[in-house]
Design a protein with these regions (language model features):
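Accessory alpha-helical/coil subdomains and C-terminal extensions
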Residues: 3, 24-133
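Acidic/polar active-site rim loop that often engages polyanionic ligands
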Residues: 7-20, 43-44, 69
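Short beta-strand elements at the ligand-binding edges of bilobed clamshell
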Residues: 17-26, 143-150
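Phosphate-binding loop/pocket of nucleotide- and phosphate-handling active sites
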Residues: 171-208
């Protein structure tokens, strides 16, 4: 048999056995930069923007980028917010004096509707805002790797080679609690990394 050590690479950050995957932090920075630019036009034109990011099965990008970019609401697959609750939250924002808002939507959010259907529902029930949709799409998969990703890739690469030389195989390199670790491949592909519930709580607090 051929010895194999895997290294996790996906922007979705949804692989079990590692806290971070290669590409995730770069995608976060790309998304936050885009939302910051969208915020500029939203603020100057009284607009409500729905920004769709990748994450059909996991909301890591939407949740962390949404918090980092100061989004008013975040819709992710792991939490069923519901359109009525979203509408009420945006109404509260409007009454508090906000002239613009950003809603970050993971492409697999729990509403069962796509971002254009969600935006249409809100626009029909919240006429104050001029509603717009921005789908960031595949730009999230490109770009120059962040410093964090470069350093992590180097650490994982060195550890992977050393693990092979020590006779290990059929395992995946990961990072857990700042330590580089090994997880059996069959265990790594069996499940998905979970959203940090404390981040959901932080998001809920910041949206008030």
């Amino acid at each position: 048999s051929f010895p194999v050590i895997g290294i996790p690479g996906t922007i979705d950050n949804d692989i079990q056995g590692t806290r971070f995957t290669l590409g995730y932090d770069t995608a976060l920075n790309t998304v936050i930069d885009a939302i910051d630019k969208i915020r500029d036009t939203a603020s100057s034109h009284n607009r409500l923007f729905f920004v769709e990011v990748m994450g059909r099965d996991a909301g890591h990008i939407a949740l962390n980028a949404g918090i980092g970019a100061g989004a008013e609401e975040i819709l992710i697959p792991e939490e069923d917010m519901g359109l009525e609750r979203l509408l009420e939250s945006l109404k509260r924002s409007e009454k508090s004096g906000k002239t613009s808002s950003i809603v970050v939507v993971a492409e697999g959010d729990k509403t069962g509707k796509n971002v254009f259907e969600i935006a249409s529902y809100i626009e029909n029930n919240l006429p104050y805002y001029e509603v717009r949709v921005s789908v960031l799409g595949h730009m999230q998969r490109g770009g120059t790797p962040s410093c964090f990703v470069r350093a992590l890739a180097s650490r994982m690469g060195v550890f992977a080679v050393e693990s092979l030389l020590e006779g290990n195989s059929n395992k995946m390199v990961g990072i857990i609690d700042e330590n580089i670790t090994l997880t059996p491949l069959e265990e790594a592909i069996k499940g998905k990394s979970r959203i940090n519930n404390n981040l959901i709580r932080v998001s809920d607090i910041l949206s008030i």
